[in-house]
Amino acid sequence: QETLDLDCYGIDCAMTLDQFFKAVFLSSGQYYSSNNFSNNKPSTVEDYSNVGSALIGYIVERITLTTFDIYCKNNIFIPLGMTKTEWRLANTPIVELAIPYSPDIPNSNNPHYTFPDYPNGGLRTNVLDLSKFLRAIIQNGTLNGTQILTSSSVTAMKTLQFGSTTQCLSFYYEAFNGKNYLGHSGGEKGVTTEMYFDTNTNVGIIIFNNDDDANLNNIISLLFNYGEKQ
């Protein structure tokens, strides 16, 4: 998979998911490359892909005839009371955002940026909001009587896929303190994020850091040690 630099600083990218995937997947597309495709048959090999995550967002748009950001707002954020969570930079109060720090950010006046394939990592939120989503996952897709995922979807998020020893559907297992936890980490220019939980005790942790070179493993271990003693 080839890396594309389509970041838009200080604004939301004008390119839609439809335009992005036509440019990447169609042989006539501006960003088409055979390197973006696997030679393996579908459902035979697991290979992590950020573009694959964005493709799920595009599929949601095609099925629902609603943009992915609006679909999430109506079906996840509002039902769960996630009032500080947005895909779009234009809808986000900049004064409430932490400043991202990275040597790879070229424009210090507009350090916040977006990208066309935003479903794979363009969400802006806070720990309190995201904890509501995590609690819903822990509680089989439901929080305070509101169901955002089916139990079968949550089961798939906990189940190893295609022979992998770590990768499930979107989530994966990571070892801390010699113990496996389920969740997802993330990183962009100027940010490092971690969200994991113990599938046996249902203890979960979330950490945000406004530095893209942060090693948070020790903090993760300390938080799990604390949480599991409560």
Where are the language model's segments positioned?
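Short, surface-exposed loop or secondary-structure junction motifs
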Residues: 1-189, 193
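Short, intrinsically disordered/low-complexity patches at protein termini
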Residues: 92-96, 155-156, 205-207, 216, ...
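Short, gly/Ser/Thr-rich active-site loops of penicillin-recognizing serine hydrolases
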Residues: 177, 211-230
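Short, well-ordered beta-strand elements
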Residues: 183-184, 192-211
